[in-house]
Amino acid sequence: MKYTQYPNSSKLKRNSDRREHDEKLSDELHNQSTIYEDEELSRAEYDSDSDSSVEDSTDNENSGKEMDEKSYEKNEDHVEDHRKRKKSKIQLLDIAEFKKENLADLDYQIGNSESKVEKGVNIEPFNIDDEIKHGVFDKDGNYIKTENATENDQQDNEEWMNDVINTEEVNRLEKEQSVKTQNSRHYMVHEALNLLKFFLVDENETVLESLGRLNKLRKIAISKKNKSLKYVIHGIELLSDLINILEKKGFSEVYEYNRLKVQDAIEEEIFDDSSRIVNHKTKLWGFKWLNKLDEYHGLYTNYEMSYWQKSYFKNSVIVKFHSEPDRDENWIHVSCLSFM
């Protein structure tokens, strides 16, 4: 009858025999060390007694005292050293020897083990290098945490929480930026120039002067607590956006543009008549009464809006350019614009 001997079983037996031999050898060394330490302590005590008797028989009193003090200190050093060695109950595990003895077995077990994922639960492998950062192993393999291990764990938890908080904050800011990008205005150059022209009340008013005029309207609305305040601010924001768009497109000194200069720039940008605005024909505007914001009226031409602004609206309406989405921030108070 043949018996099959598995390589791993013989290997484990050899390791077991070797560990048993090492333990016996360690016990013998420990016993010898204990005997040696006890003998050393006895010799120290005997030397102390001998020195004391010699010093008592010495005629020179000063030299006797000096020798007695030195002998006493020497004896105390021996006793204290012995006590320290006796107090050291924890014999640390030799990590290097542990790795050397167990590396082959660990490799074999890992190579022949099943997947580390069982029933959807990840099994984290034992990492002795990571463990000794937070504690020590005694001779029997028991793990003992150091005093600062808890502090390190708390610090790791705090860092993890900070990462979570920072991630949530980044996601929130990204969403806000995405909304801002979606809501930001995008115009072709000729569209931006056409809108800019409506903010200039006459041929001589510059863009900078228009901003000053709108700011005065804002202050008046604040002082009167008028409903128009929000829509005057919308006008200031739209004008600022138009300036930024044109500057990014390469236009310089936009703040110095007046109606005449804006119109010249429009003519340079228009490629065909379909992009040209005809005041009496092109329907561009819708409006709402401030006291009836749920009712929309439009679309109307520049000519119609200009006439009603002078004779009918009485600064009680808000207006919106036809291409703008119907959102609150796109409605502007009529006093901000000049249609012709």
From Swiss-Prot:
GO cellular component: chromatin; nucleus; spliceosomal complex; U5 snRNP
Example GO BP: mRNA splicing, via spliceosome
Region (Disordered): 1-86
Biased composition regions of type Basic and acidic residues, renumbered to the chain: 14-30, 62-82
Keyword Protease included in the entry's annotation: no
Residue ranges, compositional bias (Polar residues): 1-10
Sequence ranges of Acidic residues compositional bias: 47-59
A Pfam family matched in the record: GYF
UniProt entry keywords in alphabetical sequence: Nucleus
InterPro entries the UniProt entry points to: CD2BP2/Lin1 (IPR039905), GYF (IPR003169), GYF-like_dom_sf (IPR035445)
Principal subcellular localization: nucleus
Domain GYF positions: 282-340
Keyword flag Transport: no
UniProt superkingdom: Eukaryota
Location in or out of the cell: Nucleus
SMART domains referenced in this protein's UniProt entry, alphabetically: GYF (SM00444)
Quaternary state and interactors: Interacts with the cohesin subunit IRR1. Interacts with PRP8, HEX3, NFI1, WSS1, RFC1 and YJL149W.
Extra information: Present with 799 molecules/cell in log phase SD medium.
Family (UniProt): Belongs to the LIN1 family.
Name of the protein: Protein LIN1
Native source organism of the sequence: Saccharomyces cerevisiae (strain ATCC 204508 / S288c)
